[in-house]
Amino acid sequence: MKHSYIAKRFQSSGAGLSLDTEALAKYKDIIDLSIGDTDFTTDESIINAAFRDARAGHTHYGDPKGDPELIDAVCRAWEEDFGQRLPRDHVLVSASSCLGMALVMLAILDPGDEVIVFSPYFPMYREQIELAGGVCVDVPTYANEDYAIDEARLRAAITPRT
């Protein structure tokens, strides 16, 4: 195609996150654990609480740093769990873990920096790292090893760019 509306960096990518749904359709009872989309419906009490919150007027953009009550709760939980005070200005609540991870990668990676990711991993990790100019270094873990991190494989993956 002479003129494409897709950025060049995405034109040569493979299938990405797309699934071969035709191939998967022949299997029964598959639970997709790749992106955190559960195979059950959200509990009614949570749905009702969300409705109550919306009816109370919480339908507008919130503080870009996160809901102040949630930030306070995170700070309290951190102190209870780890015995350390966590300053409020060290907490940023994002709209999703994907957004949060992407922001972290964009903030800390320089082009060519390497990030070690233990596989299997959440599909978006590689894309977030590469979008920020980093290089994803895959260090495998295996079921027959209880997905434990192997120190030798980890050490072999570390370079001056890590």
Where are these regions (language model features)?
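Generic N-terminal amphipathic, Lys/Arg-enriched alpha-helix
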Residues: 1-9
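Short, hydrophobic alpha-helical packing/hinge segments within bilobed ligand-binding/sensory domains
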Residues: 100-101, 125
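Alpha-helical structural elements
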Residues: 5, 56, 73, 116-120, ...
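N-terminal small-domain helix-loop-helix segment of the aminotransferase-like
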Residues: 8-96, 103, 153
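A generic, residue-level signal for flexible/boundary positions that often mark functional hotspots
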Residues: 4, 34, 55, 78-80, ...
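PLP-dependent aminotransferase-like
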Residues: 89, 106-161
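Short conserved AdoMet
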Residues: 25-28, 55, 109-110, 159-162
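Residue-level detector of flexible, active-site-proximal loop/helix-junction positions
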Residues: 37, 68, 98, 122, ...
